[in-house]
Structure formats: C-alpha cells, structure tokens
Amino acid sequence: MVANFNPSVGSFVWVEDPDEAWIDGEVVQVNGDEIKVLCTSGKHVVTKISNAYPKDVEAPASGVDDMTRLAYLHEPGVLQNLHSRYDINEIYTYTGSILIAVNPFRRLPHLYSSHMMAQYKGASLGELSPHPFAVADAAYRQMINDGVSQSILVSGESGAGKTESTKLLMRYLAYMGGRAAAEGRSVEQKVLESNPVLEAFGNAKTVRNNNSSRFGKFVEIQFDEKGRISGAAIRTYLLERSRVCQVSDPERNYHCFYMLCAAPQEDVKKFKLEEPKKYHYLNQSKCLELDSINDAEEYHATRRAMDVVGISTEEQDAIFSVVAAILHIGNIEFAKGEEIDSSIPKDDKSLFHLKTAAELLSCDEKALEDSLCKRIMVTRDETITKTLDPEAATLSRDALAKVMYSRLFDWLVDKINSSIGQDHDSKYLIGVLDIYGFESFKTNSFEQFCINLTNEKLQQHFNQHVFKMEQEEYKKEEINWSYIEFVDNQDILDLIEKKPGGIIALLDEACMFPRSTHETFAQKLYQTFKTHKRFTKPKLARSDFTICHYAGDVTYQTELFLDKNKDYVIAEHQALLNSSSCSFVASLFPPMSDDSKQSKFSSIGTRFKQQLVSLLEILNTTEPHYIRCIKPNNLLKPGIFENENILQQLRCGGVMEAIRISCAGYPTRKHFDEFLARFGILAPEVLVKNSDDPAACKKLLDKVGLEGYQIGKTKVFLRAGQMADLDTRRTEVLGRSASIIQRKVRSYLAKKSFIVLRNSAKQIQSVCRGYLARSVYEGMRREAAALKIQRDLRRFLARKAYTELYSAAVSVQAGMRGMVARKELCFRRQTKAAIIIQTWCRGYLARLHYRKLKKAAITTQCAWRSKVARGELRKLKMAARETGALQAAKNKLEKQVEELTWRLQLEKRIRTDLEEAKKQESAKAQSSLEELQLKCKETEALLIKEREAAKKIAETAPIIKEIPVVDQELMDKITNENEKLKSMVSSLEMKIGETEKKLQETTKISQDRLNQALEAESKLVKLKTAMQRLEEKILDMEAEKKIMHQQTISTPVRTNLGHPPTAPVKNLENGHQTNLEKEFNEAEFTTPVDGKAGKSAAERQIMNVDALIDCVKDNIGFSNGKPVAAFTIYKCLLHWKCFESEKTNVFDRLIQMIGSAIENEDDNSHLAYWLTSTSALLFLLQKSLKTNGSGATQSKKPPASTSLFGRMAMSFRSSPASGNLAAAAEAAALAVVRPVEAKYPALLFKQQLAAYVEKMFGMVRDNLKRELSTLLSLCIQAPRSSKGGMLRSGRSFGKDSPAVHWQSIIDGLNSLLVTLKENHVPLVLIQKIYSQTFSYINVQLFNSLLLRKECCTFSNGEFVKSGLAELELWCCQAKEYSGPSWEELKHIRQAVGFLVIHQKYRISYDEIANDLCPVLSVQQLYRICTLYWDDSYNTRSVSQEVISSMRTLMTEESNDADSDSFLLDDDSSIPFSIDDISSSMEEKDFVGIKPAEELLENPAFVFLH
C-alpha cells in the first residue's frame, strides 16, 4: 500500500510478526533492499523494504477517530489505531463515512443513553465522536433533506455485535421519527420488541458467538412526508435449515428448542418433553446450557414478546407444538423391514415419539409413518408405492423437520409484519440490513457458500460506494482523477452466479438429475473452471474446491451441496400436514396450485440469488451507509485485542479493500495548515514569502521534488509512498538540525564553563587580597585601642578616689540630718494616731447603735413576711396538686398564673413597704446620729475650752491634792445598763441572721415559682401558635377543597395560559355564567335602583374595566422602580372588591390581556417588562389575599398572649420608641396593601399569575440560551493558525479573532442585563436567569469537550481558559446580579485547568481527583485523560498507572447504570417559588407609587388619587 518507501537509519517502521501480525521498531541498518529493525519487543528482525511499512511517530497515543486522517493508511496503521482506541473504551472509529465497531464484550450504558441521542441529534457526521447514532442521524437527515431513501448495512462475523448495533440504529430512528403513542404500542416499539421472537427461533450458539443470527434480516423503517415513522417490514434471508438436524460440537441448535425443554412443568407435560440430552437433534453437541442464558426465563420472555407482536395464546401453543413435534420426529429411528429396501420404526421408543409427533401435529400416526418410509410415484398408467430403506427414511425424516421449521419461521416473520403494519404509501424508508459476515471454517458447506456469495455481492456494492465517495471527494477538491483504476470483484460473481456456466447453474443442473452425486458435481466444476484464476482444486481432494474470495481463499466440501440445494416439499409430507386437524399446522402447508405443481425446478441457490437481487435492487435505490462490526477475540471477553483475528475480519469486512481503493488514488490527504505545520521545516523560506496556503504547499512540494501529487481546494493529496518520502526527508532535516543544536549547545556549555572558571579565579584573588588588607588594618586597630584603654583606666582611677571621698562626707551629713528628722516624724505620727483612734472609736459606737436598731426592725419584718410566704407556699402546693393537665385546663392555668402574678405583685408591694420603712428608720437613725455627732462636737468644744482653762489655771494655781469621785454609784449603774444593751444587741444580731437566711430561702422559692410561671406562659404561647397554624391549614384545605369542587362542577371553557380564550366576556366568568348586575359587590352600589339603573351601573363598570385594560396593556413605565401597571391593577381590583366576589370576569380579561401581550417570544424587553409587572402584582396578591379570616400578613406571627403575665412580659420587651416606629411602618404598608377575604376567582387568578411568571422567566432564559448556543460551538475549539508553528510571522485574526466569540457572549449577557435592569426585574429572578444560563454554558462546553477529541488539547485548553477568564471578569463586575453564577462553571473550569497543566505524567490519581478536579467523576476524568493530546509541546498525558487506577474504579462502579455516564444534563426547571419573589420585595416599597396618569383624568378612577 506504500510505494517507493526508502527508509533510513533511525526511521520507525512496521514489520510482520508471527504472533502479533505487525510489530513496530527502529531501523538500525540498511543493506540494499533489506533493513535490520530493532523491535520494541527487543528482538532484531531482518526483512525486505517491500515488506515493511513506515510508522507515524507523531500519531496521537489515543488514535484518531477517522482513519482517513492517518498519515499512513496501511494495515499496521489501521490495526494500531483501532487497538489504541479500544484500550480507552473508544469502540467506534470512522474510515471516511464507514463506521467500524469493535465489540467491547461489556456494558457501556453511558454511550447509549437518551441524553447521548440528544447530543447527536442534528450533528453532522464527524462533528462528534464516532457512534451508530451519528450514522443513523446522517441517514435520517439525508432522507429528509434530499428526499432519498437510505439504507444502513451492518455486517460482521458471528459475535461481532451486529444485532446490538442494529438495535441501536432502530432505537435512534425511533427517537427521531417516533410519534406519541395515542393508541396501543407504536410501530417502532413493535419492531424493537419483535427481536426476542426472531432471536428465539433464528439465533443459536456457534463456535464464535453465544447468540449468533443464523439468518439475514433487512428491516425497512417507513416514513411519511413529515419524517414520522408510518410503518415497517422485516425481510429475512437464508435461514440455516440444516442446523435443525445437524449440530456440530460445541455449538447448539436454535434457542427455542432449549427454551421449550426448560418451560414450566405443565407445558413440558403437555408436549411430553424431557431433558435436551434425550433428543437426537440436540445431543449431537455436548453444549446443552449456556452460562449467560437462563432458558426458563428466556421462554417466558419469548412468550411475552409474542403477546406484544400480536400472537395469540392458541397460536403460541400451536407454534411450540410444532417445535416439540420436530424434537420427537428427530428421535424416530428406522430399521430394515421385512421387504427388501424397506424400513420400519426401530423400537417402541421410536413408536412412542412417532405417536407423540402425530398427536402434536394433529395428524394420523400411520399416515405419518408412511410419509417417512414410503414414496408414491404417479405415472400415466398407475400409481406406484416405493418403500425406502432406513437411510433414505432418515433423510426423509430430516427433510420433514427442516421444512416444518422453515415454514414455521416464515410464518412468524409474516405474522410480525402483519402486526407491525406496512405503509405501502410511505414516502421514504430507511433499511437496516443485519447480514452475516464472511465465513471460513474448517468445514464449509452450502450455507457458507451462500453467505460468502452474499458478502461478495455486498462487497461489490460497497466498493462501488467507496469509489463513488472517492469521486465525490476528488470532485469537491477539484482534482484530476480520471486515470485512477479501482479493483473490482465481478469475476468472482461471474464464477458463482453466471448463467449458464456458473457454479449455481451447474449445481441446479446436478440436482435435476437423480443419479448425480457430489463427486460428479465436483468433477463438473473441475472441468469447467480449471483455467479460472479464482477457482482451484485442493491437493489430495476428490470433491472439494477452493474459491479465491476478496477476503481470502475458502475451501468448500460438496458432500451436502446437492441435498441442501434442493428446494421442494415431499408430496407425502405436504398432503399429510395439509390434512392436519390443527388449523395452524394446515396453514403452514397450504395446498399447492396446479401452476406450482407444474413449475420448473426450484433450488435454494436460485431462490437465494433472486432474494439477493431483490435486496440489491432496494439498496441501489437508497443511499447506503456502512457499519462494520469487529470481534476483538474469540474468548468473548473484554480487554483482549487479538491482532491477527481482527486483521482477518478487517479483510473480510472489506475495510482493507476500501483502503486499497483509497490507496489506488491519493491515500494521504492533509489540510493545508496540518501539512505546512508538519513539513514546513523542509522549506521555511517558502512559508515566509507566501501568505497563500495552496501556493506555499505547491512550492514546498516542488522544492522537495515530488511528482504526481494534487493540490485541492482545502487539502493536499499525496500518492502512496509520498508521505513516507516526506517523512524520511523530514527525519533527515531534524537529524541535521539536532546535530547543529548539539554543536551549539556544546559550544555554549564550554564557554559557560570557562566563564565560571575565570570568575572563580577572580573571586579567589579578591578574597586573598582582602584577607591581607584586613590583617594590617587589624594591627592598627589594636594599637589605637591600647592607647584608649590606658587613658580611660587612669581617668577612671582618679574619678573613683574623688567619688569615695565625696560619698563619705555626704553620708555623715545625711546621718545627722536624718536622726533629727526621724525624731520629729515620730512625734507627729503619735499625735495623729491618737486623733484617729478617738475618731474611729466614736464613729464605731454611733454605727453600732444604728445597726442594732436596724437589725431589730428587719428581723421583725422578715419573720412576719416568712410566715406569710409559707402560708402562700402551702396554698400553692395544694392548688398544684389539684390542677389537671395543662392543655385540658388552660383557662384555669391562666387564672392561677394571674393569681400568682398578683401574689408576686403583693410581695413586691410588701417588699417596697419594707424598703420604705427601712428608709424611714434609716432617716431616723441618721437624724439621731447627727444629733449625737452635734452633741459630740459640742462636748469636744467644751472639753477643749476646759483643757485650755485648766492649763491656764494649772499654770497659775498651786498644786492641790486629788479629790476622789463621789458619784461612784451612778457610774456603776451606767456600766450595768451598757452590758445589758450589749447582750440585747448580740441576741438581736443572731435573730437578724436567722431571719436573713429565711428571707433568702423564701426569695429562692418565689424565684422558682416565677420561673415556673414563665415556662407555663411560654408553653401557652406555643400551644396557641400551634393551634392557630392548624386552624389556618384547615382553612386552606377547606379553600382548596372548595376550589376543586367548583372546578369539577364547572362546565364552561377554561382559560389557557399559552393561548387565552377569545369567547365573549359576558359568557366567561371564571367558570360561571351570571348576570352582569351581580358581578360586583352590592356595597359598590349603595343607592337603591331599578333594573334599568342597575344595567347602566354594570355597563359603567364594564367601561371602567375596558379603560383599565386599554391603559395597562401598553408599557406605562415605572414609579420608584415599581411597575405602575401592577400597582394600578391592584388598586382597582381592591376598590372594586373583585377579590371578595364569588363570580367575576375581570380576572379572565386580565389574564387574556397578559397572554396576548407576551405572544412575541423573542422580544426580551417586552418580556422583561411583563415579568416585572406580573411578579409585582403576584407579590401584592400574596400579601393581600387571605382565606376564611386568616390573613397572609399575620400567619407567620405567634398569637398574642391573653394572660396577665404574658401582657406584662410583652410590655417589658417592647420599648416605646420601637413601638412607634413599627406602628408607623405598619400603617404606611397597610395604606398600600390591605388584607381582604379572597374567594375562588381571586385564588385562581393568583395561580394563573404565578404560572405566567414561570412561563415568562423560562422564555427570557431560553432566548438567552438560544442566542448563546451558536456562539458556544465556536468557543469550545480554538481556531487553527494556517501555517502553525513558529515558521511564519504572526498575523492578526481580524474578524475571526478567538476573543470575538467570547466577547459576543459577554455582549449578549450585558445586553440582557441592561434590559432587565431597565425594566426593574426583581433581583432574585435576574440571579436565577444568569445562574441557569451559566449552568447551560457549563453543560454545553463540557459535553462538547468530552465528545470531540480535537477539543481535548493543550492549546484549546488555553483558548477556553482565556474565555472563562472573560466570563469571570464579567461576573465580578456584575456580582450583584450574577450571584453564584460563576460557581455553575465548575466542571468546565476544572476540566480546562487539567488541560493546561504541565507535566501531567507526574501527577497521581489522588492529586487529580482531590486537588485538580474534585467535582469530576472518574468516568469524566478517564475520558479527558484518554482523549487529551498536547498539540503545542508534544508532551505526554497522565501515566499508565493513573489510567489503570481509573479503569479499576470504573469497573467497581460498573453495576450502577448511571455511573458510566460522563455527560452533564441541562436543568430547565423553574428554580424559584412565590415565597422567593415575596422575600425580595416589601410592602413599603410600594408606598408613594403614582398610578397611571391616563386613569387619573377619568372621573371613574377618582379613588386612585
């Protein structure tokens, strides 16, 4: 596939390996046309250059999703790409428009979820990762857009996953074209549910697959002109009939036989069945059970599927009767009869099975035996009965079993088709072909011959399609392709089906001659095709022949060719079963018409060829799409990739043939930018001089001397081998460049070493010179220091001698002066102490007297109070014992609390009286103390005078003898009284202490009672609150019940939020019809009027409503940031008492007006205005409306306390200032919002307003999402520079700058924010809009990142990161309005952060999961890590240890179906409630709002002033 490959030493190549098919290595030696390769396994291989293929060393480690993008399109390159993708669970790969699916042998539910189908809906082929959904979507879109029917051909060998792929395709087509099931099951459901029935009767275990389809199936999904599924049909081809009678070990027969043997016991008895090993048709193989299949459960599942497709229970029993009869017929053995060449049932066992089979088929036992053992030959003259020998009878038995099973299978297909329902008038169809793949076994019989013929025909169709695609590619790129030749397999088809002279024609000819055998047939083939290049005779074979198919040589054994080719029903069998008393069995063998009896010879081969021609005619009228299924290993286990096996399947599936066709033209196709980025180093001057990419590519190729290439409009087309030649030259340039770089680096390192050495020498010299200079300087410093020390020491000694002398003199003087001062101080202290002692003694005596009096009074008072308190305590205890439960007697408890409060107040008054008495006594004691002090002062004055007089007298008078005191008795009396008073005071002090203790105890008891009373009061408040809440709930439930009752009994048309009604106003009044005279409250018209006056009043009211609607239906602006329309509507409804009216049509007209106003869903400004108006009106209704007396504004407050203590506590808690402010605010709010009694129409109006708020919120949010959706697809992938690298000077992006798309997103966010702010949308709604929008951005960017491999690159991560930085800046600037929106981008932020981090291979899994990307799941991390490739620095992704850890974790979580999903879901729910809107506004915000000026001029709206 690669011509002119000239490897050099150092080139990397692929060489053949007996174990791995192909192995890579490095060329270490070139000898002429031979090279020596060092393989990655470590061994050396010598091979010819023609047997080696170049390896692309720059291919991504995770492979490419489209193999046409491979640098080298050859076998080892394709195999390596599939292997790389299979290792990371990327089981789907494109080859152009062909999808290759490698069976993972494990469940991957995340790849097939409904969310994944939504991702592929409308995406062009190749835009997202390869997937069957992409193929199905491309077929569906092409059918709708081009008006051409489509077909999807699914092929592969047994076990490759064809059936599962077909199911996925049908699921997606049902998703795209399915209609809502109004009655019963839809067409697509019936098609999908018919699979279990067909699998039960058409699938079996083979060597390579446990559930292999042994028939071909073509499902036609029919569509109408609108693209909806209108019908379907299933066509089957070549059921393997011989499997019914012949089963090779270790295969199994069809599943239905084993299911029936494992059926419930009553069914087993009814059909007289035993274990499978007892039946000849089943025990030819030792494999009777499968580990992965429970036959009993499958039996019930098949029964249920039959019910779904419309097969009745009677028909099901008849079907399984035929299946059981086949098993019994297989157990009939024959022995030689009495006559020559005759046969009879061998033994009683055979007779039993014969009888049972006759009973199950409802036919005569003897007639069944005769049909098996005899033949009737009709001649002109007579009828001859011929007996059959045992061998012939056995063949007759097997022929009957095969024809019965074949007819049964055909009946099932017809029944399914009739149940599904075909649309013969359908406009288009999409056909899904599930056909067997190319087969080559050790023994190949007639079935393999037909299967391989089918694959040859389909391969020719496939080759023509690939050729056509190549032509379209060349035409699209406008290159010359007329001289290109492609390989065709028409010669093989002529060999097989040419008439006359083909193999099938010769086989039919042999079947028409009774004496022909397989040996004569083989000899005929040898003679006819001995010179044919595709036909050979194997050595030592007498009846085998070999055909050289496109996928390889297959040797066929002709032993059973003639028997298997005969397509006729033995007349005896036909007559027997047609006469069956069972209508079902008789319908399988209808009587043959005279034309069919006299028709020409018919064979399986001819009939199959006709079916094949019919199929190809259908395919030729459709646009084909191809899916090639690959089985990675024969063990049917996950994680095993067998190169040789897969390579053979690629050849059999035609993939390699398609590659050969591509290689016949231009196998290598590179976009200009990729080509220049890779090979620009071959001619850098060309890139600098040329700004035109095609011209630069042409000059580069001309410079390197390549010929035969083509320059298209967007790509460079290279012939086979030219890419390898360019890579060889590139390797040489890189080698020379590496040598130059090494030389420069070594020169740089030598210079650097010299400079370092020179600098080191300079530093050493500098250090030495510095050391010498510092030594000299140190000596000079020491000499100067010695002189300073000597000078300072002498000065110190002189100063010390002087200081000692001076201190001695001062000490002597200080001692003398201190002694004199101390004597004077001692005298003064003694005098002052005497005065203080006298003062304290006198004061103590006075205080002692006062305390005695005070203690005596307090003791008396406390004794009395404690007596009274103990009495009260006894009463309270008695009352407490007699008091019942708190809830049952709350009125008594309140009374007791009031009494207790009164007692506490009484104690407080007593305590106050005591304090007043204390104050009076203290005042008296103070006054007496003052009198005593005054007397003391007078006495002191007299004493002083007496002392002075005595001194004077003593100085003047002579010495007199002392005279004794005469009044000694008086002194003794005073002393005794003093002692009595002291004893009395001490006793009073003791009593006072006891009284204080009792007082403390009494106070503690009183405090405990007070606490108990407070707790009781709080419990009462809580109970009342709970009771009030229950009452409110009961009232709300009664109101809802009333609303529901009125809704059920109401008969007129209800209003629709999306499309309001247009019926006349008079007949539409919230579900009721009434006279206009009764619409409004009678209080509105207080003056008695007659009928005419009442009618005029009603008309005036209608005119007022019209005036209101005409005014508010347009944008009338805002007042103080609040919508004037909402306030005006609310005031009018409040004044007209509409909220309290049982029947009114005002609300219906307002709803109709709002619905009409928001019909334009694209005008965000208009929607924002009405969003603000309706939310404000909803807030006013929420605050105003109440049901059955429970006001909305009071529902959240606890009930007011009715007890005396409760009222006292509330008065203590609230201050006068706060009460005045609250009263003022409440009064202002009540001036705007007034609680009213709401009736049913008002409550319904409130619900409709809430629905409109949610609808308008969703419309504004969805408008922003739609605006951003187109920009997000441009923001996920960085634009590629046309010539990449650093070979060309940078140029400005202009209008295509990467920042333009992100700036457009910012502009869109700003534009909407300005609109919302201008219309005063509540802040909570703005934050929710942006929060959900950022969540949508996160979902779209993250899912696109995980679905597109080209987005998981380093440069793309930097591009998206810069855009996210712009969004973060916007969030910071609009923080008040964006709220937590930035946090919604956590998934894409962490994913992009991982893409741009360096040295990923050094990061452990714990660091990734815990530090870098804690939000991402292991499936998401695994997806990013495996898809990542560094397009800037060519660095590696994470290590294999990290990948292995992720795989282990995913395997552990594989039991959870949702755990495998790596995509995010967009949340379109309404993220707020009415309470959120209410919490964002306050009643006082509406104070001072001016009503609509237009209405103020209307006399009917005077109340608005």
Curated annotation (Swiss-Prot):
GO terms for cellular component: cytoplasm; myosin complex. Keywords: Actin-binding, ATP-binding, Calmodulin-binding, Coiled coil, Cytoplasm, Motor protein, Myosin, Nucleotide-binding, Repeat. Residues 1148-1452 form the Dilute domain. It comes from Arabidopsis thaliana (Mouse-ear cress). One of its GO terms (biological process) is actin filament organization. Belongs to the TRAFAC class myosin-kinesin ATPase superfamily. Myosin family. Plant myosin class XI subfamily. PROSITE patterns: DILUTE, IQ, MYOSIN_MOTOR, SH3_LIKE. ATP binds at residues 156-163, 209-217. Homodimer. Interacts with RABC2A and RABD1. PANTHER family: MYOSIN, MYOSIN-6. Its main location: cytoplasm. Disruption phenotype: Impaired growth of root hair cells. No visible phenotype. Expressed in flowers, leaves, roots and stems. It holds the Pfam family Myosin_N. Residues 495-529, 531-554, 589-612, 612-634 are annotated as: Actin-binding. It comes from the Eukaryota. It is found in: Cytoplasm. Residues 734-763, 757-786, 782-811, 805-834, 830-859, 853-882 form the IQ domain. Head-neck domain associates with cytoplasmic (transvacuolar) F-actin in areas coinciding with the tracks of fast organelles. Signal peptide: none annotated. This is Myosin-6. Residues 8-57 form the Myosin N-terminal SH3-like domain. Myosin heavy chain that is required for the cell cycle-regulated transport of various organelles and proteins for their segregation. Functions by binding with its tail domain to receptor proteins on organelles and exerting force with its N-terminal motor domain against actin filaments, thereby transporting its cargo along polarized actin cables. Involved in the tip growth of root hair cells. Plays a major role in trafficking of Golgi stacks, mitochondria and peroxisomes during root hair development. Targets the peroxisome through an interaction with RABC2A. GO terms for molecular function: actin binding; ATP binding; calmodulin binding; cytoskeletal motor activity.
